Regions:
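Asp-based, Mg2+/Mn2+-dependent phosphohydrolase catalytic module
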Residues: 2-6, 10-16, 23, 28, ...
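Acidic-and-aromatic substrate-binding clefts and catalytic sites of carbohydrate-active enzymes
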Residues: 15-19, 45-46
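Structural recognition of the conserved hydrophobic beta-strand(s) that form the central parallel beta-sheet
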Residues: 37-39
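Conserved phosphate/oxyanion-binding catalytic-loop motifs
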Residues: 42
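Active-site donor-binding segments of glycosyltransferases and PAPS-dependent sulfotransferases
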Residues: 72-76
Length: 256
C-alpha cells in the first residue's frame, strides 16, 4: 500500500511533465489492485481541476485515490474572513471556494507556497499573530522549488513566524496527523484493514513529508528527482528514511 507525493515525485518541478516511471508506476498499481492514495500539498488549483491536470498528463489516478489540503480544509476552518498569504492562484482559489480576503480583522492567517514573500508580508503576519489571530499553514513543506531555486517552504515560514511571535500554528496538509489520517481513510476504502504500518510513503521531501510519516510507523522512500539530489543528502536523518531511489522508476521496476 502506498501514499505517493506529486511535485518532484510524479511530475517535474521544472516543466510539470511526468517523471521517469511515474505513469508506469500508477498503471502497475491499478492493474495489480495495489491500494494507493496520491497525497499532494497542492494549494493553487481546485482539487478536482488539479486531479484532472494530472490525468491529462497520463497519470491514470483512479477515483477515490487523491487528497490535497483543499479536500480537508473545511474541517479545520469553514469559509470566513481570513488573511491569505501566498501565490495569486492560491488567493483566487480560496476566494472561489468561499473564503474572503481580510487583513484587517481576519479569523485566521492562512499561509501557502510563494516565491515572492517580502519582509513586509512577514511583518504583517507577525502583527496579526501577536493580536491573537490563529496561524494555519496550508502544509509544512520544507522547501519550495521553483524555476530551479530553493525557497523556504510553508513549514519553514510558519516555524519562523512561530519563533518570532511565540504563537503556535496548525497545519492542513502533509505531514499533519489529520491529513495522513484522512488519506488512511481513503486507503481503507480500498483495503479495510489498512493501517499506517502497512503503508510506504514515496516523496522527494524528507523533512516535509517523510519524517512525520515515519513517526506514524510508515515505511519511507525518498526519491532524488525533486527537492533533494545526490549531492545534497548529507543532512538527511537516515533513521527516518528506509530507502532512497533516483526516481519512481526504480520502485516501478520492483513492482512490475
Amino acid at each position: 500500500m502506498y501514499f505517493i507525493d506529486v511535485q518532484g515525485t510524479l511530475i517535474s518541478d521544472s516543466d510539470k511533465s511526468p517523471i521517469n516511471g511515474a505513469c508506469e508506476l500508477i498503471d502497475t498499481l491499478n492493474s495489480k489492485l495495489i491500494p494507493y492514495v496520491i497525497i499532494t500539498n497542492n494549494t493553487k488549483i481546485k482539487s478536482d481541476e488539479f486531479l484532472q491536470t494530472l490525468r491529462d498528463k497520463g497519470l491514470a489516478i483512479k477515483d477515490g485515490a487523491y487528497l490535497d489540503p483543499f479536500c480537508v480544509l473545511n474541517e479545520i476552518i469553514s469559509p470566513c474572513n481570513v488573511a491569505l498569504f501566498g501565490a495569486k492562484e492560491f488567493v483566487q482559489t480560496m476566494q472561489d471556494i468561499g473564503y474572503t480576503q481580510d487583513i484587517k480583522d481576519p479569523k485566521a492567517i492562512l499561509i501557502a507556497s510563494w516565491d515572492k514573500f517580502s519582509f513586509d508580508d512577514f511583518a504583517l503576519i507577525n502583527e496579526l499573530a501577536l493580536k491573537g489571530v490563529k496561524i494555519i499553514a496550508m502544509h509544512e513543506t520544507s522547501i519550495y522549488k521553483k524555476n530551479g531555486r530553493l525557497y523556504p517552504g510553508v513549514g519553514a515560514i510558519a516555524s519562523m513566524i512561530s519563533y518570532s511571535t511565540g504563537a503556535k500554528f496548525s497545519s492542513v496538509g502533509k505531514p499533519s496527523l489529520g491529513f495522513y489520517t484522512a488519506a488512511l481513510e481513503l486507503l481503507k476504502q480500498q483495503n479495510p484493514k489498512a493501517e499506517f504500518k502497512d503503508i510506504t510513503i514515496i516523496s522527494d521531501d524528507a523533512t516535509g513529508d517523510l519524517y512525520g510519516a515515519k513517526e506514524l510507523n510508515m515505511s519511507t522512500a525518498l526519491v532524488l528527482s525533486g527537492k533533494i539530489d545526490k549531492s545534497s543528502t548529507a543532512n538527511l536523518n537516515r533513521d527516518k528514511i528506509d530507502n532512497i531511489y533516483d526516481d519512481v522508476s526504480k520502485i516501478w521496476e520492483i513492482l512490475r
